């Protein structure tokens, strides 16, 4: 349990995921879980250091909340995995990169935003004591409408072969990744909708959702599944309800029968009034019991 900024309390779990990007969306190829009070970096560090899904030559996109020089150095040195991540504004490496970009004054056009420009700055690792591997930076300059002044974003990478344009192009995949993650949490996969507090049941539910999510996106990246690539699970479920017939199962004694819903309703409407009344009474009692359990 943790205390929120507004004074309320929250209980739950934390889920860390490694996403392998495909042509459309991606697969959750590695996950880790912990109690909600565990820090994000503490949860993800073992995952990044040991996950078999990360292989030499891979490129990892990270959020600035995961800034950890030791982990970044381990990934590059021991695993030969490169990283792209934004630096915090108050870091010395950030200020160094901005000043060097201004001194060189060799700005390039941003690949996707007409009113922004960027510059490549090589060798900023000496201003970040926790980082033990060479770093290049991409300084993005833009007009901050809220602050009404020129502002900067600094992306760093351990892949020294990348130019400024490719650093930005790779990192611009992050907003789409975050949108997909929000869909997984609340969109239709209902990752946050837990019916039990038992850890074993929570783990089973989460792993089932993660596996289903990945299998869905794996299918969406095949030729037969391309028609589902740009649709959320919610949209597909709604479309299915609108266009496909539904069925119900009716039990009586030791027997059951599967009826198409409209056919079953038609059959019920053809029953004699006394039988319909008995059925109406039974349904009222049954629905009342269900509502009490919920």
Task: Show which residues each predicted segment covers.
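Short, conserved catalytic/metal-binding motifs centered on acidic residues
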Residues: 1, 20, 26, 44, ...
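Active-site-proximal, Lys/Arg-enriched surface segment
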Residues: 1-21
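Active-site beta-loop-alpha junctions of metal-dependent nucleic acid enzymes
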Residues: 32-53
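Short, well-ordered alpha-helical microsegments
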Residues: 40-41, 67-72, 164
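A short alpha/beta connector and helix-capping loop motif
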Residues: 69-88
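Short gly/pro/ser/thr-enriched loop/turn and capping motifs at secondary-structure boundaries
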Residues: 89-95
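Short amphipathic alpha-helical "interface-anchor" segments enriched in bulky aromatics
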Residues: 164-195
